[in-house]
Amino acid sequence: MQLALICENPERQNELDELAQRWGLSHDENSIFALVLTDTQLELRKLDEAKLGAVFVDLVSGAAAHRRKFGGGRGQAIAKAVGLKKGVMPRVLDGTAGLGRDAFVLASLGCTVQMVERHPVVAALLDDGLARAKQDPEIGGWITERLSLLHASSQDALVKLLEDPDFIAPDVVYLDPMYPHKKKSALVKKEMRVFQTLVGADNDADSLFAPAMALATKRVVVKRPDYAEFLANAKPSTAIETKKNRFDVYVKAAMT
């Protein structure tokens, strides 16, 4: 993929070069997107809409820290959806990791989560945020133990993992496909505006459902906007609703 590659600290230029090679990125000075390596982090900027600010992964402070400390623990809708309860810590595969927020919440509650992200820029941002979080004295220990990242197409990853005899199948496959926002919602979060331009909607999301159901041993959970149809038109066993979203739960077996 091509976009502007910018290093703000000359001493880190080698890091940016290695990063570009690892994720298959090449420099395009005319791109409206820039992947910028600052003194502290990797971030994405939309150059023609500077007011949107930078998009980066921060699992240590800000919103992530607030949700970890005050987000409601196991009472959160996502925790209920994956079947998290006393004595039950599901192994989760997050097939559409994005910026890792939902995976981080589940890991902070005790789940082991393997994240899958197919877009190279998003995967690079997530990998950078994960690396920084692992260095944090407060959360680094359990981040290292519980969170991992696989860069691959979600569908390919699900199928390949299903065929791998050494892979321990997850209890839960969690999917949160990018869904087109309603045109009238002008105040879409800056990240979503940047992402929808860069990544686009997951138009092939329906194709994730069958391999997800085959891979999960206990359940599949699909996060949807409240106005969205069911993934692959499959009616869930149950649904947990929040103010703006819905967690469709497809139960295969009881959580034990």
From Swiss-Prot:
EC annotation from Swiss-Prot or TrEMBL? 2.1.1.242
Q: Name one Pfam family in it.
A: SAM_MT
Q: Provide the reaction this enzyme catalyses.
A: guanosine(1516) in 16S rRNA + S-adenosyl-L-methionine = N(2)-methylguanosine(1516) in 16S rRNA + S-adenosyl-L-homocysteine + H(+)
**SUPFAM superfamilies xref list:** S-adenosyl-L-methionine-dependent methyltransferases
Q: Specify the domain of life of the species encoding this protein.
A: Bacteria
Tell me which UniProt keywords the record has, alphabetically: Cytoplasm, Methyltransferase, rRNA processing, S-adenosyl-L-methionine, Transferase
Where S-adenosyl-L-methionine binds, per the record, is at R101, D102, E117, R118, S153, S154, D176
Q: Which GO terms describe its cellular component?
A: cytoplasm
Report the GO molecular function annotations.
rRNA (guanine-N2-)-methyltransferase activity
Q: Where in the cell is it found?
A: Cytoplasm
Biological role: Specifically methylates the guanosine in position 1516 of 16S rRNA.
The similarity annotation says:
Belongs to the methyltransferase superfamily. RsmJ family.
Please identify the protein, giving its name as recorded: Ribosomal RNA small subunit methyltransferase J
